[in-house]
Curated annotation (Swiss-Prot):
Source species of the chain: Cucumber mosaic virus (strain FC) (CMV)
Domain of life, per lineage: Viruses
Family designation: Belongs to the cucumovirus capsid protein family.
Chain positions covered by the region annotation Disordered: 1-28
Protein purpose: Capsid protein. Probably binds RNA and plays a role in packaging.
Protein's name in the database: Capsid protein
Main location class: virion
Amino acid sequence: MDKSESTSAGRNRRRRPRRGSRSAPSSADANFRVLSQQLSRLNKTLAAGRPTINHPTFVGSERCRPGYTFTSITLKPPKIDRGSYYGKRLLLPDSVTEYDKKLVSRIQIRVNPLPKFDSTVWVTVRKVSASSDLSVAAISAMFADGASPVLVYQYAASGVQANNKLLYDLSAMRADIGDMRKYAVLVYSKDDALETDELVLHVDIEHQRIPTSGVLPV
């Protein structure tokens, strides 16, 4: 036997024989698979409750959809006692509501804390009936039913929480400008009284272009 054959035979002797099957998975492996499945289901549940799109702002860093423009309105909540609520219907300017059949694609809320802000607020947009008086009881029930995504905005030492925007996609609902009066911005002041000089809400409504001053907006 030459040297190469001797070396090969040595390797074969050292190689362990292949067994019929791998050992059964450990309990740790089984627990990991169960945990992974639970996390996957949780992610799917959370994704179903999130807005369809969550860009920083379609007004500033993302172009409007082709054929669309936007109208912005500003809401400044009044004083809200600790644990109480505030609601305001979306009221667009007359120059926009004149074209009530123009479709609305998205609504975005941007929370702008003022220097004195030191609270925690919950903010959402909901479609409400024409007869709703947006009472504290009615708004409380809408926050509790989980039917709409909610932005929780908390005081941050930097002055601006990383996530201060919430975007709703209404394109599948075929909502139009005339429907906007059926929607309301709702605010819940959770941990402290919210003063009038603590918070401003900017609501950006993306809709089909409308004639303005005799020309179409760019």
